[in-house]
Amino acid sequence: MESQQLHQNPHSLHGSAYASVTSKEVPSNQDPLAVSASNLPEFDRDSTKVNSQQETTPGTSAVPENHHHVSPQPASVPPPQNGQYQQHGMMTPNKAMASNWAHYQQPSMMTCSHYQTSPAYYQPDPHYPLPQYIPPLSTSSPDPIDLKNQHSEIPQAKTKVGNNVLPPHTLTSEENFSTWVKFYIRFLKNSNLGDIIPNDQGEIKRQMTYEEHAYIYNTFQAFAPFHLLPTWVKQILEINYADILTVLCKSVSKMQTNNQELKDWIALANLEYDGSTSADTFEITVSTIIQRLKENNINVSDRLACQLILKGLSGDFKYLRNQYRTKTNMKLSQLFAEIQLIYDENKIMNLNKPSQYKQHSEYKNVSRTSPNTTNTKVTTRNYHRTNSSKPRAAKAHNIATSSKFSRVNNDHINESTVSSQYLSDDNELSLRPATERI
């Protein structure tokens, strides 16, 4: 009866054999599948006895390897082959552009023979494999007890980054290199390589490893064809074909220069002048901005500079707009000269212009405030009393008296002058004043 059931269900043989093998130690020279069917009940009886002694049961490593035996239990995941990094498949640039890359993890997996031996700038093959970009895992070694369940755990990165990093677009022209390098630097920063990229001052936080250098070199070539690079980049790579960091450092410096150019353009477009500062200071400011733009190969014509300056004039300088509106040949030096002339004229007029309201210095207000009272009492004293404080009637009397006295004196003086002149002309004698007789 039992043999018929075994023939009807042959898989039960493997199940019974597996239970007996895993629960009882078997000699290394004996195949667990070679046990006859007649001895199966005996193995089953032994297995019930051994199940109560699980503490002394050996591990699965005691079971000899058998290629014909398929175990229903999943095999344990082997430890990583390269330290803390795990092996990942390679991907071509076309696949990388179609789907987001993962983060930087295993740069040593790249084939870097050309990086070590190539005498010139290497042109990558369109199907050149590029690694996945996965962040570094934790440096702590895995616990050997948890190796069985390692396949179900998700490795955690050191830093919080996105799940995917979008690769930079391929460089299409030499003029777009300054824009492309911004995306490439952002691509490296999002991939946990920002600490090896030079900052605005050309400083880096740490030295990059050989694998990181190889990765930067290969990704730079994959997305920046050599014939589309600017001349200054080609000159650097002709000296040292792998000196990508120097290219990035100078690119960052040029970005700062471009930012200064933008600031200069904004300052030139928003010029304002109303005479509150000297004309010389205004001229120096404008000339410095124009000269700085010229050093960066940006020439500002006199006509454009004059239009921007005239737009910002106000006050007494505003009428210069109408004067230069019909002019076709504008000279910046001439405009500065006219601004200086108006500024000097206004300065002279302000010095000679009398004040509309005279300040009476003879009056002095003295305010006294009592600290104990809330009301403020103001007392005005006239320390210098003048004639202006007399009543109007007294003023009129004094004026009439003084005018009458002046007329009498003037008539007397005129009469005596005429008589003395008449005597001197006729008799040529000088009269002495009469003296009183005693």
Swiss-Prot record:
Bias-annotated ranges (Polar residues): 1-11, 19-39, 49-60
One GO cellular component term noted in the UniProt record for this chain: cytoplasm
A biological process term (GO) from this entry: viral translational frameshifting
Function per UniProt: Capsid protein (CA) is the structural component of the virus-like particle (VLP), forming the shell that encapsulates the retrotransposons dimeric RNA genome. The particles are assembled from trimer-clustered units and there are holes in the capsid shells that allow for the diffusion of macromolecules. CA also has nucleocapsid-like chaperone activity, promoting primer tRNA(i)-Met annealing to the multipartite primer-binding site (PBS), dimerization of Ty2 RNA and initiation of reverse transcription.
Leftover remarks: Retrotransposons are mobile genetic entities that are able to replicate via an RNA intermediate and a reverse transcription step. In contrast to retroviruses, retrotransposons are non-infectious, lack an envelope and remain intracellular. Ty2 retrotransposons belong to the copia elements (pseudoviridae).
Domain remark in the UniProt entry: The C-terminal RNA-binding region of CA is sufficient for all its nucleocapsid-like chaperone activities.
Protein name as it appears in the record: Transposon Ty2-LR1 Gag polyprotein
Organism the protein comes from: Saccharomyces cerevisiae (strain ATCC 204508 / S288c) (Baker's yeast)
